[in-house]
Amino acid sequence: MKQPAPTTRRVVVVTGASAGIGAALARVFAAHGHELVLIARRENKLDALADDIAAQGRPRPLVLAIDLSQPDAGARIKAELAAHGLEPEYIVNNAGFGLVGEATQLDHTEQLAMIDLNIRSLTELSLAFADTLARLRGGLLNVSSVAGFIPGPGMAVYYASKAYVLSFSEALHHELARRGVRVSVLCPGPVPTEFQARAGIPRVPFPRTGLPRVVGSNALTCTAEEVAEAGYEGLMRGRRVVVPGVANKAVTIITRL
């Protein structure tokens, strides 16, 4: 007797989901009825978020405590999804971190780890699941920043990594469109989250003059929840670049003139 084909469940994979924009994105996708896989290093934070989502009457997300800067991270994620009978309909690449200081003075190993997480891991997951996203007619949301539009003395490697994410994602938007995959790049301005504390913000040099300037003015700042809502809506509408906030949009337009 022929055995029935195994069934799989469609999920949204969210990296960097332990706090900030990543956690907010997870909540937004869950609120719209998507089942989730949450990935970050801090398992306790992921478990707390998963419990909270389940308490809202949604399926409890699968929690994967994985360091995405490690070379085997992509293979581990694919293996875990397969073992649980899950297929990613959407990938949200949010994991990343920044460091404040002159590039020549900061620890080189830490900066290379930043490149591994902000660039290599994002690229690996974007490409590794492209065929699945195409088959499921899903989407890819990569998180960049308004920093991706300008050079950033004082955060040189971080700004450069976000410029890569912006350029790479815009190219994928066109390459994968013919295969039915929506690709959007989310470019928030300053957001008061744990990310800023880790990076040593709020004071960084202003990119064009090198003069100190406070990051997080009321005109540019959005909440993590506002950013997440804009990212979800932009992805579902197939927008190439999503910049939350009128002031932030103005900044990005000016830099491209």
Q: Where are each of the predicted segments found?
A:
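SDR active-site lid
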Residues: H174-A250
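Conserved glycine-rich cofactor-binding loop
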Residues: S18-A19
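Conserved NAD(P)H cofactor-binding loop of Rossmann-fold oxidoreductase domains
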Residues: N94-L99
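Residue(s) in the substrate-gating loop at a strand-loop-helix junction
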Residues: S145
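Active-site helix of classical SDR
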Residues: S126, S161
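Conserved glycine-rich Rossmann-like NAD(P)H-binding loop of the short-chain dehydrogenase/reductase
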Residues: H32-L49
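Substrate-binding pocket helix/loop in short-chain dehydrogenase/reductase
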Residues: E102-I115
